[in-house]
Swiss-Prot record:
This is Flagellar protein FliO. It comes from Pseudomonas aeruginosa (strain ATCC 15692 / DSM 22644 / CIP 104116 / JCM 14847 / LMG 12228 / 1C / PRS 101 / PAO1). GO terms for cellular component: bacterial-type flagellum basal body; plasma membrane. Belongs to the FliO/MopB family. It holds the Pfam family FliO.
Length: 150
């Protein structure tokens, strides 16, 4: 409701200020006065200060988010994702290890379904992560040549 009230107030304010601006133009003042120049400088300084404050706040919040994400336990995790295989745009199979047990899960947008509990654990090579990081995928995409050079 307030937004609509404010939106109706702006055109009325603009219509009131138009005759005032026209009256100033008829006085014949060719050069701006010192007060107008200092007012413009003050407005510019306020604009730059506000913009700097908002940008600083964005950087501070980004730094805090990184610190909070790193604070979580990293070492001895009980639940780990071992492998993931996409089946479609939103469906995938995920192999999860919970303690000593490995479970194959089916993930859809609305459900997580346990499909199979493996009796013998699957051993994956240690050097390769289950899902590549974003940076690795980006490098792979950048190194691909779209023209198909041999």
């Amino acid at each position: 409701m307030r937004r609509y009230l404010f939106a109706g107030f702006l055109p009325a304010l603009a219509s009131l200020s138009a005759p005032l601006c026209a009256a100033e133009g008829t006085t014949g003042a060719a050069a701006p006065t010192v007060g107008a120049a200092s007012g413009a400088a003050a407005q510019l300084a306020q604009l730059v200060l506000g913009l700097g404050l908002v940008i600083g706040l964005i950087f501070l919040l980004a730094w805090l988010v990184r610190r909070v994400q790193q604070a979580g336990p990293r070492g001895n995790r009980l639940i780990r994702t071992l492998a993931s295989q996409p089946l479609g745009p939103r469906d995938r199979l995920v192999l999860v290890q919970v303690g000593e047990e490995q479970i194959l899960l089916g993930l859809t947008p609305g459900r997580i379904t346990p499909l199979h509990v493996l009796k013998e654990p699957v051993h994956l090579p240690d050097g390769e992560p289950a899902t590549p990081e974003f940076a690795q995928r980006l490098l792979e995409l950048l190194n691909k040549d779209p023209k198909g050079k041999p």
